[in-house]
Amino acid sequence: MSKPPPKPAKPGQVKVFRALYTFEPRTPDELYFEEGDIIYISDMSDTNWWKGTCKGRTGLIPSNYVAEQAESIDNPLHEAAKRGNLSWLRECLDNQVGVNGLDKAGNTALYWACHGGHKDIVDVLFTQANLELNQQNKLGDTALHAAAWKGYADIVEMLLAKGARTDLKNNEKKLALDMATNAACASLLKKKQTAGTARTFK
């Protein structure tokens, strides 16, 4: 039996940096990047040379260069989702940045996409097999709470169609329905809850 291929780095353990200066490689296996480029570091096992990807090219980068000449981007997927930056979001996912990572407030990238009304971003996140729909942040809010509060009925509808839970309460004991700021969102959530209670035997 042949040996199984080595396991790839776990998604979410990829470190992301923005280069502050251009790096000119001295050997063919080193990675060229320019000031402002986003670098995805996938392997930091060698203390001197880290493996990274930039603009679809992979190569080695001196670790001390990254430490001194690049700034760390802690939650790149969240930043992309917040800004509605679709190409950066896709690049993060292509480079194995974890889709369910949490920022300091306990929010997922999906939460920020729903909060900002970025339907195209939500669409792309929905293509990720292990996406966590019902993650609650430190305030107990889910992506559904955010979409309802911001009044994005189209996104509320998308989340419900994917199976987002309507029975989760935040720290203030509020359901997404209680947070709905317009009739369209409230109506969708009410309809879903009524359908849900008819099926449960609590």
UniProtKB/Swiss-Prot annotation:
InterPro entries per UniProt: Ankyrin_rpt (IPR002110), Ankyrin_rpt-contain_sf (IPR036770), SH3-like_dom_sf (IPR036028), SH3_domain (IPR001452)
Keywords: ANK repeat, Cytoplasm, Repeat, SH3 domain
Keyword Nucleotidyltransferase: no
Any one of the GO BP annotations: signal transduction
Residues in SH3 domain copies: 12-71
Compartment(s) of residence: Cytoplasm
Pfam families: Ank_2, SH3_1
GO CC, alphabetical: cytoplasm
ANK repeats by residue range: 72-101, 105-135, 139-168
S-S bridge residues: none
Superkingdom of this protein's organism: Eukaryota
Function: Induces bone resorption, acting probably through a signaling cascade which results in the secretion of factor(s) enhancing osteoclast formation and activity.
Name the record gives this protein: Osteoclast-stimulating factor 1
Organism: Gallus gallus (Chicken)
